[in-house]
């Protein structure tokens, strides 16, 4: 899980979701998991 101020989709499988007011990227590639913070 990478914590970044700006989250971007890295590949086609990356999806942007909002959880508890936080913007997150979920993907089939674990390396692509990101959270805004």
UniProtKB/Swiss-Prot annotation:
InterPro entries recorded: Ribosomal_bL36, Ribosomal_bL36_sp
GO biological process terms held by the UniProt record: translation
UniProtKB keywords: Ribonucleoprotein, Ribosomal protein
GO molecular function: structural constituent of ribosome
Listed GO CC annotations: cytoplasm; ribonucleoprotein complex; ribosome
PROSITE patterns according to UniProt: RIBOSOMAL_L36
Keyword Plastid tagged: no
Family to which this protein belongs: Belongs to the bacterial ribosomal protein bL36 family.
UniProt protein name: Large ribosomal subunit protein bL36
Taxonomy of the source species: Bacteria, Bacillati, Mycoplasmatota, Mollicutes, Mycoplasmataceae
Gene name linked to the record: rpmJ
């Amino acid at each position: 899980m990478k914590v970044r101020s700006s989250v971007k989709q890295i590949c086609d499988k990356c999806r942007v979701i909002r959880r508890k007011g936080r913007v997150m990227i979920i993907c089939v590639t674990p390396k692509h998991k990101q959270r805004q913070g």
